[in-house]
């Protein structure tokens, strides 16, 4: 009986030890899960867009949505109005880990994945319907290109239709060649277009444009931007004229670094992707509306829209576009394969019966 008693005690002790170890392991697991759930990730995000604009309000809504839906696990520090510098400066800070993301124009996008800028090639698309169609088709390629180069693409907003704005009248392409036109410093797409057009532009950071327009003997008298951008950046107050038919429909991107994105738990990654896409879509639709409204506001403030390209001008512009495309292909900034893919998509889209009536190239902002 004694032997049986000791055997029973030993068995009970072993069982108690197993239960004890299991409880300890469970407690550790739960505490680790709680720590993960409570970890706060701070997203430092920068944009050139000034505060108080329609875009900045949409970004503020995005920040609020992220922080609420993450239950405070993501906090966003927003740096608006170019306080972190021009887009190349912001990208350098992201790569160094000082920032984590930003809202960029095509200029900044080109420094991450340049083939995406086929979407803002001058005079390539006849309408936003065409650019929307092609964008949807090549978006998987663009997202993969961003990811390969260290970034996650969250959303795809739109800057909108780009016009020349000047202190001088513009009535011909020759007039354009005689202007002191700003070039966003370091922009290969702008460089290629102006080279093909035989224009000698003045390269400046976007941060210096307003100063030079304001100066009595400033280095530039002409810029290019959207109608909404001319107001948001206050450039319109120093200008008098604008071209009616725009050059292109400029793109934008909402991005975060893979370094930041990959640290997030899966649910927070999905939250960023879902809300970022929605913000990009909201800004794109808002930009189209704001650009339409801005035409009237600019006219009320003394901006005269002029120069509806005639057929000869348009043929020359298309030749300039093709020459610029050749330069960009030679440097592999936008590879020939991307141009060919885009042109094939456009041809197929234009050949649809419902699109046969849209034969004329008309990049005027939609009514």
Residue ranges of predicted features:
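Bacterial N-terminal signal peptides
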Residues: 21-31
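Bacterial N-terminal signal peptides that target proteins for export
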Residues: 2-23
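Short linear Ser/Thr-Pro motifs
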Residues: 31-32, 70
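Sec/Tat signal peptide C-region and signal peptidase I cleavage site
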Residues: 33-37
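N-terminal secretory/targeting leader peptides
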Residues: 38-130, 146-367
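A gly/proline- and charged-residue-enriched helix-loop-helix capping module
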Residues: 129-143
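Short regulatory "switch" loops immediately downstream of catalytic or recognition motifs
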Residues: 1-5, 212-215
């Amino acid at each position: 009986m004694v032997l049986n008693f000791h055997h029973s005690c030993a068995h009970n002790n072993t069982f108690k030890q197993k239960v004890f170890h299991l409880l300890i392991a469970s407690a550790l697991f739960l505490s680790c899960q709680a720590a993960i759930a409570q970890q706060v990730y701070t997203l430092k995000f920068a944009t050139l867009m000034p505060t108080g604009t329609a875009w900045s309000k949409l970004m503020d809504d995005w920040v609020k949505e992220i922080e609420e839906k993450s239950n405070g696990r993501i906090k966003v520090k927003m740096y608006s109005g170019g306080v972190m510098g021009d887009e190349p400066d912001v990208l350098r800070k992201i790569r160094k880990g000082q920032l984590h993301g930003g809202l960029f124009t095509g200029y900044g996008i080109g420094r991450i994945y340049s083939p995406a800028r086929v979407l803002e090639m001058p005079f390539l698309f006849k309408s936003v319907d065409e650019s929307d169609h092609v964008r949807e088709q090549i978006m998987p390629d663009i997202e993969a290109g961003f990811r390969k180069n260290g970034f996650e693409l969250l959303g795809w907003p739109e800057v909108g239709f780009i016009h020349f704005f000047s202190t001088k009248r513009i009535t011909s392409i020759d007039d354009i060649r005689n202007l002191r036109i700003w070039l966003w410093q370091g922009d290969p797409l702008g460089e290629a277009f102006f080279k093909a057009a035989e224009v000698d532009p003045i390269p400046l950071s976007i941060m210096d444009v307003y100063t030079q327009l304001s100066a009595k003997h400033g280095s530039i008298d002409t810029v290019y931007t959207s109608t909404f951008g001319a107001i948001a950046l206050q450039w319109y107050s120093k200008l008098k004229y604008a071209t009616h038919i725009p050059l292109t429909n400029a793109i934008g991107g909402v991005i975060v670094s893979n370094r930041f994105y990959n640290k997030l738990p899966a649910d927070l990654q999905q939250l960023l992707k879902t809300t970022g896409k929605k913000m990009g879509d909201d800004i794109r639709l808002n930009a189209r509306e704001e650009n339409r409204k801005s035409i009237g506001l600019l006219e009320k403030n003394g901006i005269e829209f002029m120069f509806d390209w005639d057929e000869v001008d348009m043929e020359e512009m298309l030749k300039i576009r093709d020459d610029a495309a050749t330069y960009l292909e030679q440097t592999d900034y936008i590879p020939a394969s991307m141009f060919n893919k885009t042109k094939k998509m456009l041809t197929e889209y234009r050949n649809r019966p419902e699109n046969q009536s849209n034969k004329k190239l008309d990049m005027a902002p939609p009514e």
